[in-house]
C-alpha cells in the first residue's frame, strides 16, 4: 500500500481506538453526542499518554487531522469511517435503523460529508440508502 493509504488507515484506526475507550456514541444519539467530545478527548490523552513522546505526537496529529476533515486524506478516511455502519445496517435489513426509527434525513445528514471524500462512494452510498428507504428499513420522514 502507498503512504497515503497507510495514513488514511492509521487515521481510522487511531480514531476507533479512542472511540472504543471513550465508549462509542451511536450515530443518531443526540444526547450521547453532548458528552462525546469530552469523553474522546480524555480517552485520547489517556491512551496516547502511554506512548513515547514521538509516537504520541504523531498519533495525536493524525487523530486531529482526522477530526478536522480539512485534508483530502482525512475526508476520505471519514467517508470510509461512515461506510462501515451503513454496510452493517444494509446487511442486517436495517436492524439498527428500524430499532431507532432513523429517518432518511438523519442518514443523509450523517453521509453528507461522504461526497467530500469520494463522489463515487457517495453515489454508491446514495443507492444503498434509497434501497433501504424503499424496503422500509429507513423512515422517509420523521
Residue positions per predicted region:
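Histidine/acidic-rich helix-loop-helix segments that form or flank divalent-metal centers
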Residues: 53-94, 105-110
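Divalent-cation-assisted or electrostatically stabilized phosphate/pyrophosphate-binding catalytic cores
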Residues: 29-46, 73-75, 97-116
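Short, function-defining helix-loop hinge/capping sites that tune catalysis or transport
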Residues: 23-27, 87-90
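Conserved catalytic core of Hanks-type protein kinase domains
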Residues: 11, 16, 50-53, 79
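Active-site alpha-helical segments that house and flank conserved acidic catalytic motifs
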Residues: 7-25
